[in-house]
C-alpha cells in the first residue's frame, strides 16, 4: 500500500467506537470483537454498554460474574481504551449527538433491542446511542441473533435498515473451514470491523478456488 493511501485509510478509519451487547446468545463473539479493537492502533476509544440480560448471558456462556470489571474479565487484562458504561445512564456521553462517536456495533443484538431501535424507543443507553447514530447518519451495525424469525422480527429489521442501520446477522462463515468456535467468532468479528472501515490484517480472505473435482457450480 502506498503511503498516501495508507494515510487516507487511517484518517477515514473510525477512532471512537460504541459497542453494545444485549441478551442474545453469542457472548464469545463479543469477546473476540473487543480483543480486536483493543489491539487495533487505529481505534482510540471504545465505549462498552451491556444490558442486564447480556450480563446473564455472559455469565452463563463465558462463566464470568459481576457487573464490575467486565472489560477486564472479557479481555483477560486491563484496558486503557475500553470504557464500560451503565445502560441505565441515559445521560452518558454517547447519548448525545455532540459526542464524536464514529460508529456503533450491537453484538449480539437481541430481537427485543432490535424492536426498540427500529421503533425509536430509547429508554436505556443502548437504544439512545443507536438512535443518535441514526439521526446523525453514523454507521450502526446490528448483529441480530435469533432463529427462526417471525414477521415482526423481519419487519423490524426492514424498519431499522430503512432508517439507516446495517443488519449484520450473527451468521458465521464456513468456507474457511474453522476448526473451533473461537476461529468462527474471530472471523465474524473481522468482517464486522471491515464493514465499518477497520479491516484486520489477519482476517481470512477468499482467493477463489481451483476446480479439481470436475463438478460444475450450480
Give residue spans per PLM region.
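A cross-family phosphate/adenosyl-ligand binding-site feature
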Residues: 2-140, 148-218
Amino acid at each position: 500500500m502506498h503511503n498516501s493511501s495508507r494515510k487516507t485509510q487511517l484518517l477515514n478509519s473510525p477512532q471512537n467506537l460504541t459497542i453494545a451487547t444485549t441478551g442474545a446468545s453469542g457472548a464469545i463473539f463479543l469477546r473476540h470483537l473487543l480483543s480486536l479493537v483493543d489491539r487495533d492502533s487505529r481505534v482510540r476509544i471504545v465505549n462498552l454498554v451491556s444490558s442486564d440480560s447480556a450480563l446473564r448471558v455472559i455469565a452463563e456462556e463465558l462463566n464470568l460474574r459481576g457487573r464490575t470489571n467486565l472489560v477486564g474479565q472479557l479481555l483477560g487484562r486491563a484496558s486503557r481504551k475500553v470504557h464500560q458504561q451503565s445502560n441505565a445512564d441515559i445521560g452518558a456521553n454517547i447519548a448525545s449527538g455532540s459526542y464524536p462517536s464514529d460508529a456503533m456495533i450491537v453484538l449480539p443484538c437481541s430481537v427485543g433491542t432490535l424492536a426498540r431501535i427500529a421503533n425509536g424507543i430509547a429508554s436505556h443507553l443502548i437504544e439512545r446511542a443507536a438512535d443518535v447514530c441514526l439521526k446523525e447518519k453514523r454507521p450502526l451495525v446490528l448483529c441480530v441473533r435469533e432463529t427462526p424469525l417471525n414477521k415482526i422480527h423481519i419487519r423490524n429489521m426492514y424498519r431499522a435498515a430503512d432508517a439507516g442501520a446495517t443488519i449484520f446477522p450473527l451468521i458465521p462463515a464456513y468456507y474457511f473451514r474453522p476448526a473451533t468456535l473461537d476461529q468462527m467468532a474471530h472471523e465474524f468479528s473481522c468482517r464486522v470491523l471491515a464493514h465499518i472501515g477497520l479491516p484486520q490484517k489477519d482476517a481470512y480472505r477468499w482467493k477463489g478456488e481451483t476446480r479439481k473435482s470436475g463438478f460444475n457450480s450450480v
